[in-house]
Amino acid sequence: MKLLCAGVPFLLALCTLSAACSSNKAALRNDSGSPNDKASEVIHQSRQGAEKVTEFDLNHDGKPDVWEYTVKSKTAEGKEYDRLVRKEMDINWDGKVDVVRHYDENEQISKEELDLDFDGKIDQWNYYEKGVLVRKERDLDFNGKPDLWIYYEKGHIVRKERDTNHSGKVNYWEYWENDHVDRIGEDLNGDGQVDRWTKNPNPGG
């Protein structure tokens, strides 16, 4: 059976960067510009509005590796604090942003953007609800548009969808049960409907 890739292994450096941010010596960066929401554009986003940017040099090469963006906010008790809204990371030490994490009002991750081929553009989008991963979108042909969608429930894959002919429409579906593919649906005529189902003869393997 044809199975879709479950995801791209994350570089060990990403974990190191995330864990070390809170304790590393910080320096402020003055930066301004407008945000860019287009998927085909560069992954780096300039400081927006009243955001404050703090830089971290984790490998001590004199260049920043992590950028934390915060805004002034208040707790329920009215106490002011710097709320994290976005974090950018350079995980291969080339001076370019490779990962961007967005955070909600509770400072839980809500979205993650990744540059998998290190060309400065977004290739994967991860979406979270209350800090829990619910969907991944991948741009497999690097044209700035997702063509693979992976859906999660309680940390497990439940469905994958794929645009295999670059038509902009899903024409391939995988339904998962107990961490294995249960059945595959294929659209053979481009009408957006499943024309052929294939049952996995060995769903536990």
Task: Place the predicted regions along the sequence by residue.
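Bacterial N-terminal signal peptides
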Residues: 7-18
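Calcium-binding acidic motifs and repeat modules
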Residues: 21-205
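Positively charged n-region of N-terminal signal peptides that target proteins for export
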Residues: 1-5
